[in-house]
Amino acid sequence: MLLRKKVRLFSAGLFFSLLSCAAAWAELKTGANAPSFTAPAALAGQTYHFVLAEALKKGPVVVYFYPKAFTSGCTIEAQLFAEATDKFAALKTTVIGVSGDDIETLKKFSQGPCGGKFAVAADLDRSIIKAYDAGMLIMPSMANRISYVVTPDSKILFVHSGMSPDQHVSSTL
């Protein structure tokens, strides 16, 4: 019985260790071309199609991936990005969050934690997550917590990965 319990604890620890470091194993590198994408998105509860190429005409874009709307870490991260919207705007930088959530969920998320300050895009077929190497190692259909700063010439300027939501905003400013 004790051995079985130890095996379960070890397995759980291994699972969460892999989960927390998965972003470091799969991500686009600085200087790489940022894959272009168009996706259904929500801003302040209204839907539209976000087009990365159009956003880049206005300046840099922070493309941040998060696992699931309304979970604790993703809610904190969205609130932090919402609080920093004016700082990003001063730098002529657009922020777009991307997850595998459906657009109805994201309409609510864009009003709640995002405060109507920035858009969130639905990647139902996970093509954007895959193109940006942003899938979790052990659950590739779910986005990892990873942020990219993309320059107007579609190059990756900066990458920040890590499951803690706290540093994504400050590191991408």
Segments the model singles out, each with a brief description of its role:
Residues 75-114, 126-128:
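Structural microenvironment flanking redox-active thiols in thiol-disulfide oxidoreductases
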Residues 11-21:
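Bacterial N-terminal signal peptides
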Residues 142-173:
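Thiol-/selenol-based redox modules, centered on thioredoxin-like
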Residues 22-26:
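Boundary at the C-terminal end of the N-terminal hydrophobic targeting segment
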Residues 1-5:
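N-terminal secretory signal peptides that target proteins for export/translocation
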Residues 96, 110-144:
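Short, internal strand/loop/helix patches
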Residues 52-75, 79:
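Short active-site neighborhood of thiol/selenol oxidoreductases, capturing the structured segment around
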Residues 38-60:
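A short beta-strand-turn-helix
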